[in-house]
Amino acid sequence: MQVTETQKEGLKRAYTITVTAAELDAKVQEKLVEAQPDIEMKGFRKGKVPLAMLKKQFGPRLLGDAMQDAIDGAMRDHLETSGDRPAMQPEVRMVDGETWKEGTDVVVEMKYEALPEIPEIETSKVSLERLVVKADEAAIEEALKNLAESAQNFEDRRKGSKAKDGDQVVIDFKGSVDGELFEGGSAEDYPLVLGSGSFIPGFEEQLVGTKVDDEVTVKVTFPAEYGAKHLAGKEAEFACTVKAVKAPKAAELDDELAKKYGAEDLAALKGQISERLEAEYKGASRAVLKRALLDQLDQMVSFELPSKLVEAEAHQIAHQLWHEEHPEEHGHNHGNIEPTDEHKALAERRVRLGLLLAEIGRKAEVTVTDAEMTQAVLAQARQYPGQERAYFEFVQKNPQIQQQLRAPIFEDKVVDLILEGATVTEKEVGKDDLQKAIEALDEM
């Protein structure tokens, strides 16, 4: 077996691998010997079939396996000897693959880009500022007010009052299409909050300004994508009778409100809110700190990037951003999306930082534990109520999904490792300053 270098330019590598006919035949023979003890043929006891007969019957079937094993072995030996780590799966092409005949040498061309040598960074030279926000009384009171509004009740307005946006009207209604009542289109004593958007578009607006005992005919058109296909896109009329008009009234900020949210009393609820707010502030502060760290790391290192990795990342960025701008398009029938120079620059940054963090993690032997993976899967599974088990099984069968869940955990652990050696000072700021810092991340 021979491996000949044909290209070594920057990170690009190309080799010709030659497996001689004799080596390939020996590999086939080896596989036949391995299989012989388990094979039975008429006229022979199990394991006693002559190799010549086995080769005649099974040789062609084993030839492909032997060829693959030989090539894989040559590639593996080459990578171990050279120390190269391919940035992506090597491209492998069999020379004369269409015309190759048994008894001749197998010649394969292998191409790949090697991962670059990545310089070590001195974490002690990294200097960062961590924003610290305390949950003050004003923020807690604001959160309490929002909870009270969420738990609001409705009280009857004075007789003759007109319904306003945000009011609750209690109505009887009967819906019809082309003069015929349709199933599920009628109800009595139905409480509807105007402006909630819970009914067909245009329905609630026509009830603003109505009073108790008013009879109103609401005319709407069902959306084209409406769930009930027989109603989709159809014009409909709803005969409505207004039975009550109620104004919203926020719940009182007292122990009863606290109990609604699972707290023992109002003081305990305030404590829970304070903890939740500070956890939110801490998460936001970490996002700002992490971006600042990545910005510094990006300026500290410079090395050649595998062009194929950058190209793949740029296309992924372009594709993702296109779909964000065209949310109505869910498939891939949109033609080719060419990355812009901005996409390519962002791709270079992501690849550079990704390789740097991966190398730091590799050298420090950073790993993602089974427990951490389980927590990540559980967090994702909660997005599919009632289908958690199915999601677990889906993840178990999909290494790509596992890697998507593992990657951010690994990255965060490497970030923590770098922060341990960096100089990080704390700066206490208000929540508005933190919010501005978060908003600035989206603009970059």
Swiss-Prot record:
GO terms for cellular component: cytoplasm. Pfam families: FKBP_C, Trigger_C, Trigger_N. GO terms for molecular function: peptidyl-prolyl cis-trans isomerase activity. Gene3D superfamilies: 3.10.50.40, Trigger factor ribosome-binding domain (3.30.70.1050), Trigger factor, C-terminal domain (1.10.3120.10). InterPro entries: PPIase_dom_sf (IPR046357), PPIase_FKBP_dom (IPR001179), Trig_fac (IPR005215), Trigger_fac_C (IPR008880), Trigger_fac_C_sf (IPR037041), Trigger_fac_ribosome-bd_bac (IPR008881), Trigger_fac_ribosome-bd_sf (IPR036611), Trigger_fact/SurA_dom_sf (IPR027304). GO terms for biological process: cell division; protein folding; protein transport. It catalyses: [protein]-peptidylproline (omega=180) = [protein]-peptidylproline (omega=0). It is found in: Cytoplasm. SUPFAM superfamilies: FKBP-like, Triger factor/SurA peptide-binding domain-like, Trigger factor ribosome-binding domain. The keyword Cytoplasm applies. Its EC number is 5.2.1.8. Residues 166-251 form the PPIase FKBP-type domain. It is an enzyme of class 5 (isomerase). Keywords: Cell cycle, Cell division, Chaperone, Cytoplasm, Isomerase, Rotamase. Involved in protein export. Acts as a chaperone by maintaining the newly synthesized protein in an open conformation. Functions as a peptidyl-prolyl cis-trans isomerase. Consists of 3 domains; the N-terminus binds the ribosome, the middle domain has PPIase activity, while the C-terminus has intrinsic chaperone activity on its own. Belongs to the FKBP-type PPIase family. Tig subfamily. This is Trigger factor. It comes from Cereibacter sphaeroides (strain KD131 / KCTC 12085). The lineage of its organism: Bacteria, Pseudomonadati, Pseudomonadota, Alphaproteobacteria, Rhodobacterales.
